[in-house]
Amino acid sequence: MATTEYADATTAEDVERGIEGLRRRHPVESAVDEVLSRKRRRRGHDVHNSRSLEEIGKGLNAFLARRLDDPFRVRDLARMPGGASKEQFSFELEWTDQGATRHDQMVLRMNPPASVVETHRVREFQLLRAFDGIVPVPFAYWATQDDAELGEPAMICGLSRGVAAPTKGERTASGIGTVYGPELRTKLAPQFVGHLAAIHTLDPSTVALDAFQVPAVGTTQGVDWQLGRWDRAWEEDSFEPHPTVTLTRQWLWDNRPAIDRISVVHGDYRNGNFLFDEDTSEITAILDWELGYLGDRHHDLAYAMLGAWGHLDDAGRFVCSGIVDAETFIADYERLSGLAVDPERLRYYTVLNMYWAVTACSATGARIAEDRMTHLDVMMNFMGGLGASLIPELNRAITEGA
């Protein structure tokens, strides 16, 4: 059973009481509350039923007709492989933009009834728009959080060219443990670090991010919202308590660092979440902004350095995200960003990242698979094992130096 007293509620009144209880115990940003509450209301009622391309196309045409004044045509609509949370479809749009006829390759990203992480399409849209021209990102065309438009919240963005992993190498699930090789690493590393520095040094007040709440500098507000998010997910989705998770949650609350500078946090910055051109070795797109928020830059740094994403090189050094060794990563980041990296904050966010990964993989993934609310049942079973593998690392991390 899940740990919340309302996890198995069946009446609408019980569900709403449960949501109110979760809100009181675990305050989060309003947009995050919106998507978490939406998932809870649908549990036990909605299951994932794969819709035909004809149905998707009908909804897509109606969606575009509400936004485009001139005639348009959708061509070559197809399901896309990959991804660990959203359904994706590629298509070509023939349309008129500012008087010129265009033929653009686009991607429709749609929520299933529930995901391993619940995220807000308008937030993702705003981040892509904010970083257009600053780092390589797909262009964001339109987004909606209204189920009535396409059946689920959705976003349409440009189709970026490139590959997530070398085509001659072994493909891995969601990019985990991607191996690029020494020559390619040398070319990718400066870009990987440089783009992260550019993300963190953008002043959030200069771009349109009204779907985000801004934490106050000198407080723990930003990390409080993150802990609230993952505590709420664990309480709602886990099947039984786990002593390591209980200890980790307490450690995280007891050791919260106050934020010294507000940065845009990508939230999922690692190998597998960017594309590159195999001929030029140029990073062509940074993807998967859905977990982005305004907070502490150390969150992204610690995440890119997690053991699950990297491997040892021939000299026995750990290669962060399969791209760059930790010492070079930190030194180059500090040089390019002008921002200091605090080892204690890095340790804290390493623990937080492992905690949310355990929650998403071992609790939410298993829960939505059981509830038949995802199109990725097999992937959710795989991710449960990944979450379990992080438990010993969490034990070591919270007892280190204690």
Name each model-derived stretch.
Residues 287-292:
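Activation of the activation-loop gatekeeper triad in protein kinase-fold domains
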Residues 75-247, 251, 256-261, 278-280:
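ATP-binding pocket architecture of kinase catalytic cores
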Residues 299-338, 352-371:
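Active-site activation/catalytic loop segments of kinase-like enzymes and analogous catalytic loops
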Residues 262-264, 284:
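Conserved protein kinase catalytic-loop anchor
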Residues 274-276:
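Hydrophobic residue at the +6 position relative to the catalytic HRD Asp in the kinase catalytic loop
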Residues 340-352:
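All-alpha amphipathic helical-bundle segments outside canonical DNA-binding/catalytic cores
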